[in-house]
C-alpha cells in the first residue's frame, strides 16, 4: 500500500521533478555555483526580489484538503430553480471518472499537433456535430468561453457578415440579463451602438439582431417573420438558445437564424458557481471563415486514412494578430468533450426523453400554481415559468429559503422558476408547497405530469430526428462507453505519458490533490446567482486566493472574473481605457506592442477599441529601445499603453525592462505586462513593483489548472491601485450590473470559472513561499540545462546575461532546412516517434522550436528528451551527408504508424527498425501515433467539420 501523506509537507519534492542530488548535478553541468547564483545570473538585479513572499509556510496535502473542506462546508447547497442559463444536470458517472478525473484527458494540450491528438479531436468533432445538429446550422466551432461571451462574439461576427452600414446592433430585452451586460461591455469597446428592446414591436435599422430562444423568462416565440424582416434590411440574425430545448423546438437554422450561441452546461457539467462551461457557436456556411474559436475538421493522413485536425487556422488570433476576428485562444475543450459525451451516452432517444420530461414537469407545475391562484405570465414554455406574485413575493421567498430552495427574483413583484433533469416529483411537490405557504393557502397535491407538448406552439415544434449521426447511437451499455473512452484516450499524448515541452505554455504537474476538490458538491453544485448568504465559502476562497496572487505579483487589486488569459488581457486594456477616459484623456487609444508579442495581445487591443502600433525587436530579441522611443514620439498624446511579455517570448529577462516602463510612463501611458511567463518570476520578481501597471495571470499555466486539451483556463487581471476602480464589474444575484460600476463584466458569471479556483488555492497552500520560489528556480534550471546540453547540436537563438535563458529556450533549426531540407515541422513530427509532444513551433520566430520544460520534469525525463533531440540531429546529419535520401527519410515521413511499419512491402530509404525504435528505451514503452502525417491543405480545401459516415473509416 502507498503511504498517506505525512502531517508535514512532503509535496514540494513531489511537485518539483529533479531531486536535490539531481539539481546539484545539473548545476555543475551548466557551470552555476548554486540555484541562488543561477537566479542572480538570469534575473536583472534591478527587479530581483530578495525578501520572501508574505505567504504561509507549505502544508501537507491532508492539512490543506481538510482546511478546504472547512471552507467548502460554509457554502449552502440549495435546490435551485434560478435557471437564467445555468441548470442542474447529472454528470454521467462514467464520464466523471474517466474524463473529468482522468489525467489522460485533463492534462493534454490544445491539439495543434493532430497526429497525437486524435482522441480528443474525435470527441470535439462529436461536440461540433451535436451542436450543428441541434441548432440546424451548417457548422459549429469547438467551444467558446461561456454563453455571454459567445453572444458578444456573435455580435462581432454579425458586424463582419452584415450587408448593412448601420452601426446599430439590436438585442432583445428577453435575453438573460448577464448576457446583456457582457454584450454591452463588448459593444462599448468597439463603438457599436446597442439598442435593447422588444422585438415584437419591430426592428430598428441595424446590422444585426440578438434574440433569446426560448426567452429568459420562458416564452417560446415564432421568429420566422422577424428573421425575414431582418434579412430584408441586410441584418444578420443571431440567437442565444438552449441545447436541451432544441430537442423539442424548431432549430434556429430552420426559422432563419444565421448564428446560434449558448452554453452546453446542462449537458453534464455542474454549476461550479459559474464555470467552467463550454459556450457554443454554430453558423451558416457563409460565415465560417470569420467564426471565432477553434474548429475541428476532417482531413486525411499521408496514407490516405481519415484524420482530424484544427481547420482554418489562418483565421485565428495567433496568426492574424490585430486583424484577427477574435482574441479567443484557450476555450473550454474539456467541458465541450464532456457535453459531447453526454450526448453519446444518452443518445437521441435519451436526450429527447430528458427534454420531454423537463417540459412535462414544467406543465404540471404550471397547472399546480394556477390552482393556487398564481398568475403565470407566459403561455408558452419549455422549462421556465414567469410568475406574477405581487405583494406575496417576499413571503414566497421566505418560505423558499426555509425549504432550502432558490427561486429567481425578477423584481419586487415577479418570480421565475426553471426546471431541469435533476428535478424529481418530490422536489416539485416541495416547490408547490413553498408557494402555498407563501400565499397562506393549503397545500395542494401535484397532479401527475402529462406527456404533452402543449407549452410549445405547433408552429415551432421540432420535426424530424435529432442527433442522427451513428456515433450518438453507438453506446448501449456502460461497458461500451468505458471502452470507447479508453480507445479515445489511448490515441493521445498527454502529461500522464510524457513531457510536453511547449514553450510559453508551462505544461507542469497538475497534482491529484489539487484536482480532488473541484468535484466536491459544496463547490460543484452552487449556482452563480445564488444569494451571497449561501456562498461564504466561495467568497473566502476567492478573497484568500486574490490576496495571495496580489502578494505574488506585487499588485494592489485583482479580478478573478476573466475565464481565459485572452479575457484577462481584454479586461486589463479596458481598465486602461477607462482610466484615461476618467482622467479626461479619451484620445489615448494607441497600444504599442512588440513584434514578438503573443498573438492575443494585438487581438485584445483591437477588441478594447485601441489602435495597434508595432514596436521592433533588436537583434537579440529585445524591445528595440530606439524604436520604442520613436513610436512614443510618433503617437504622442494618443499613447494609451505598451503591452510587453516578461520574460520575453524569446526566453530571456530583458535588462532594460524598467527603462521601458519609465519611457512609457513619462509619455503618459500605462504598461501592460503579459503574465503568460509568470512561471519564471514567482518568488524572484514582482511585476507590480518594477514598473508594470497591470498584468493578467494564466492560472492554467503558472498555478496548475490543467490545460484540458484547450481549456478551461482562468486569466485573472491584477492592477496597481490607480487602476483598481476599473476592474470588471461584478453582477448581482439577478445578473445585473451596479450602476456605479465603471467597467462592465467580461464573463457571464460574477466570478468567471470559479469552480476550478480550488486548484491554484491548493497549489499555493501546498508549496508555500519557499516552495513557490524553488519551483521558479528549478524551472529556470531545467531550461538552462536543456539549452546547455543541446547547444552543441542546435544553436540557442537568444540568451540573456551570462549566456543564460529564462524558463524556456529557442532552438534555431532554420539552417537545417538549407543543408538537409528538414524543417521544424519535420523535427516535431519525428519527436512523436520518440514518444514526445513537440516544442512550440515557429513562435516567436518562424522555423524555430521553443522548449519549456517546467520545474515538474525530472532529470531522467530531461535526459530522455535530450537523447531524442541529439538522435534526431544525427538522423539529419545522415541526410546532410547523403547517406539518407533528402525526400525519403525518417523525418520527412514521420510520424510512423504501426500500419505503415507492418505493411507487407517497405520501399523507404531507411530500415523499419530505425523508424520504430530509434533509441533502445522505446522497446520498453512505445507510443504509436494513430495516424500518419496529416494533410493540412487538403483539410482546408475540403472543409468538413462534422462526423464522417461510419463507412469512411472502413
UniProtKB/Swiss-Prot annotation:
Enzyme Commission numbers on file: 1.4.4.2
Residues the record lists as N6-(pyridoxal phosphate)lysine modifications: 701
InterPro entries (alphabetical): GcvP, GDC-P_C, GDC-P_N, GDC_P, PyrdxlP-dep_Trfase, PyrdxlP-dep_Trfase_major, PyrdxlP-dep_Trfase_small
PANTHER family tied to this protein: GLYCINE DEHYDROGENASE (DECARBOXYLATING), MITOCHONDRIAL (PTHR11773:SF1), GLYCINE DEHYDROGENASE, DECARBOXYLATING (PTHR11773)
Subunit note: The glycine cleavage system is composed of four proteins: P, T, L and H.
Family that this chain belongs to: Belongs to the GcvP family.
GO cellular component, one term: glycine cleavage complex
One example GO MF annotation: pyridoxal phosphate binding
Pfam families xref list: GcvP2_C, GDC-P
Function: The glycine cleavage system catalyzes the degradation of glycine. The P protein binds the alpha-amino group of glycine through its pyridoxal phosphate cofactor; CO(2) is released and the remaining methylamine moiety is then transferred to the lipoamide cofactor of the H protein.
Protein keywords: Oxidoreductase, Pyridoxal phosphate
Disulfide bonds: none
UniProt cofactor(s): pyridoxal 5'-phosphate
Enzyme class: oxidoreductase
Keyword hit for Ion transport: no
Protein name: Glycine dehydrogenase (decarboxylating)
Listed CDD domains: GDC-P
Catalytic activity: N(6)-[(R)-lipoyl]-L-lysyl-[glycine-cleavage complex H protein] + glycine + H(+) = N(6)-[(R)-S(8)-aminomethyldihydrolipoyl]-L-lysyl-[glycine-cleavage complex H protein] + CO2
Gene Ontology BP annotations: glycine decarboxylation via glycine cleavage system
